Amino acid sequence: MLKYVNHDIVFQEFPDEVTLAVNLSQCPNACPGCHSPYLWSDTGELLGLSRLKSLAAQYADEITCVALMGGDNDPESVLLILSELKKAMPGIHTGWYSGRTALPECFGEYPAPDYVKTGPWREECGPLSSPHTNQRLYRYHEDGSREDITYRFRKK
């Protein structure tokens, strides 16, 4: 079961995308130094496909991507809802920010989101823009291949 607390339009989560970022609660990772500890608790509204489609439709003229931020408590629901959204809105890209170091076993059972960020927040490693980051951002292609695009966050 997925619950969301809030959402916002963001510009830096995925390269070249204007993203509707939906913040999910019930995060089991509880990373030290997390910038959103309010997402650890069981709070917010249920997020089903109809609600996610409604949010995406509300901003359809402004966004190119819809991302779920969190969802590690129920990764199968994340993958299912993003694949269903993509079917319903074929022009939209999808993304998932996971705090886990590895993808869940169920990942191969669903079409991959266009973008997947993995890795818990570790202050000593820094964000995606840090050369020492433990986090990775992957771009999944239609043929099933993936590309590590973490380098796109680093200044030249």
List the predicted regions and their residue ranges:
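N-terminal [4Fe-4S]-dependent radical SAM core
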Residues: 1-23, 28, 36-41, 154-156
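Conserved Radical SAM active-site core
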Residues: 2-10, 36-94, 102-106
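Short secondary-structure boundary segments
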Residues: 98-100, 119-120
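Classical nucleotidyltransferase
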Residues: 107-156
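Short beta-strand/turn micro-motifs composed of small residues
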Residues: 70, 98, 141
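Short, glycine/charged-enriched secondary-structure capping and boundary segments
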Residues: 20, 37-38, 81-84, 109-111, ...
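Structured loop/turn residues at beta-strand edges in well-structured enzyme cores
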Residues: 29, 61, 110-111
